[in-house]
Every structure is written in structure tokens, then in C-alpha cells.
Amino acid sequence: MGSLKEIKVRIASIRSTQKITAAMKMVSSAKFHHAQTQTEHTLTYANKLSAILNGLLSAECDLDSPYTEQRKVSKVAIAVFASSTGLCGTFNANIWKELSATIQTYKNQQIEVRLYPIGKKIADELHKAGYSFDTDFITIGEKPSYESAVSLANRLMELFVTGKA
């Protein structure tokens, strides 16, 4: 057993570590809450956009667009969003689990999958698992902008129109 002084130093060290851990937990919690709030605002927008698109598609007029034509699904593109840091609890792990299951489902149906990871953690997981993926958009989630979203959307729309996804 150590001396009384060694024990006091060890206790002080543990308390210091606990304070640092608590501060890190508060910071990550605040960041997560901020991201969750932004996601909720986006969900409202997405629901309205979906309603508008459903209204357009159910209208009786002919909509001549390459995005509305029916075709056999042989290729898909998946843009998967995750964090670039690890202070998110199980967030990245849950996304990886869902992505793996989705990829496997498509592979079982002999459907080719193209991957577009947004976030360093999900890109690292894809790399470890041996998947090939587009690296152009990995960091756009760190500082989201309209321009980067348009760039990703244009790439995905181009792939769809050309039949590559």
C-alpha cells in the first residue's frame, strides 16, 4: 500500500480527470443538442417538400422528366451522413450498423451500390470494411453550405439521369 501522500496525489489526479471528463461530456452534449435541433428543423422542411412532390406526382398533367420515369432498379447511390468526430455516443456506430444492413440488402438483390460518405468516421468504417466510395464529399458536413449541398445533389442527379445510380 502506498503512503498517505501518494494516495492523496492519486485522489487529486482522479478528481481532475473527472472534471475534464464532465466538461467534455457537457460540450459533446451541447453539440449533439444543437445538431438534433438543426435536424428537427430540416425534418419540417423535408416533410413539406415531400408533400409538394407528392402533389406534383399525383397531378393529372404529364410530367416529362428523367426523374419521374419508371425503370428497373439495378444501381443505387447512398449518401450517408455521420460525424467527423467520436464524441457522439453510439451515433456513428448506429449509422454504420444501418448502412451495413442496407448495403447487404441491396447486394442480396444483385443491385450495385455507390457510396457517398459525409463524415470522417463513416468513411473510416467503409475503408476498414473494404468498400470503395467517393471521397469528394467526406468533409462537407464539417462546415455545411448551400454550395456543397448543391454540388452533392448535382452529382447524385447526374448519376441518376445517366443510369450510373
Where are these regions (language model features)?
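Conserved loop-to-helix interface motifs that mediate assembly, gating, or partner/ligand docking
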Residues: 2-165
